[in-house]
């Protein structure tokens, strides 16, 4: 029986997994290479919580919609509520308006409705030149406080400066080698971003995307969070957060003046009335980090078979999947590839993993687990003939 679980990664993916599992009675050890939680893409000071909507027909099976509702419910819990500022979010209409969102949407006039530019301006406290979708329950999370609260669960032990160097299966347990020593676990959850010396995720494709936010000294009497492709938050701790750049395959995390300028230009283009209110960029702060995405932009969450990639090289592609021997390995799970949506989506990923560990039915449609299945890319490559090599070609 699973008693002790090691989670690698102390960003929102790992911290939410740890909390959900600890809440179900497991002892959880979280290992992270950094000296504090949220050192990667989860470490921006504020994280915006809002959904990207789809039409009424697709909503019941839409990951982001379901994740948004689930996250809002969790954030009402007292220990989390203090880290959530429910400012509401105005999603400004773009040139390509959201035709799918209208009175037929199941959330209409309850969780979302449309405001004309005058009403949107009154809601925001600043002049806006276009209509917007209004999400009254949305807002932003103060990330540091939330991560620390998640990791403070009585069943969670967080170990920092613990870079994981490898993991091997020994009978029914994992033995994890880190710079803070060895750890044994009945199950292992990998929830770290990007590359690692652990080979257990070979075949799971991730792409880095650099993003830089700008922190602007308080200058705007903004009451709500504005989204327009980028975003602008009300002042918090003396700064507005403006974000964010999007630079695929850029691995550097230095703060760049041109990225500040990009954020300023996007803000001025979408909210012209605020352009002249911005303080000089010399007063701006910033943070750059890497967000990791999958090819289909859905995260990977659930059980992963690290032997699958090699096993499929022995089988030519065909319509139906081959029957493979069950790997003699302890359980391995992943929660990775959340991109910029981790603070909304990671909770659902954590629940999916916990449900698989405990063999508990999921409250969400079966299609969600299939959409997030980590091994979907390996099977896809096999079906497309990218894995199999005839024996004579192997020498």
How should these model regions be labeled?
Residues 133-187, 191-192, 196:
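Helical element adjacent to the flavin cofactor pocket in flavoenzyme catalytic cores
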Residues 279-395:
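C-terminal catalytic lobe of FAD-dependent flavoproteins
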Residues 56-67, 92-98, 133-149, 254-259, ...:
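Short beta-strand to alpha-helix junction loop
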Residues 29:
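Conserved beta-strand positions in the Rossmann-like core of class I SAM-dependent methyltransferases
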Residues 46-124, 129:
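Dinucleotide-binding Rossmann-like beta1-alpha1 core, especially the glycine-rich loop
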Residues 24-26, 153:
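Conserved dinucleotide-binding and phosphotransfer motif residues
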Residues 6, 13-24, 33, 41-48, ...:
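Active-site substrate-recognition segment that forms the wall
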């Amino acid at each position: 029986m699973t008693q002790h679980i090691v989670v690698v990664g102390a960003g929102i993916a790992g911290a939410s997994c740890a909390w959900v599992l600890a809440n179900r009675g497991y002892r959880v050890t979280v290992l992270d290479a950094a000296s504090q939680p949220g050192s990667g893409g989860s470490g921006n000071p504020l994280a915006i919580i809002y959904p990207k909507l789809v039409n009424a027909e697709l909503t019941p099976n839409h990951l982001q919609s379901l994740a948004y509702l689930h996250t809002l419910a969790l954030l009402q819990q007292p220990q989390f509520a203090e880290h959530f500022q429910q400012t509401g979010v105005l999603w400004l209409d773009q040139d390509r308006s959201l035709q799918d969102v209208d009175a037929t949407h199941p959330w209409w006039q309850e969780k979302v409705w449309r405001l004309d530019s005058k009403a949107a301006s009154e809601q925001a406290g600043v002049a806006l030149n276009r209509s917007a979708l209004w999400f009254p329950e949305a807002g932003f999370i103060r990330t540091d406080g939330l991560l620390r609260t998640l990791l403070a669960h009585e069943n969670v032990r967080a170990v920092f400066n613990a870079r994981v160097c490898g993991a091997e299966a020994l009978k029914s347990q994992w033995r994890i080698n880190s710079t803070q020593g060895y750890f044994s676990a009945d199950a292992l959850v990998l929830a770290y971003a990007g590359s690692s010396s652990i080979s257990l995720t070979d075949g799971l494709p991730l792409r880095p995307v650099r993003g830089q936010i700008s922190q602007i000294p308080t200058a705007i009497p903004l009451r709500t969070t504005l989204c327009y492709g980028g975003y602008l938050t009300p002042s918090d701790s003396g700064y507005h957060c403006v974000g964010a750049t999007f630079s695929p395959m850029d691995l550097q995390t230095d703060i760049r003046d041109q990225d500040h300028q990009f954020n300023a230009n996007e803000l001025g283009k979408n909210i012209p009335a605020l352009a002249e209110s911005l303080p000089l960029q010399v007063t701006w702060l910033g943070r750059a980090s890497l967000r990791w995405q999958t090819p289909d932009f859905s995260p990977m969450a659930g059980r992963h078979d690290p032997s699958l990639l090699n096993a499929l090289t022995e089988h030519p592609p065909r319509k139906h999947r081959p029957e493979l021997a069950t790997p003699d390995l302890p359980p391995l799970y992943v929660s990775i590839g959340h991109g910029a949506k981790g603070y909304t989506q990671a909770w659902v990923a954590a629940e999916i993993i916990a449900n698989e560990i405990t063999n508990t039915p999921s409250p969400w449609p079966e299609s969600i687990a299939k959409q997030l299945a980590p091994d979907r890319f390996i099977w896809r490559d096999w079906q497309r003939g990218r894995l199999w090599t005839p024996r004579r070609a192997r020498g």
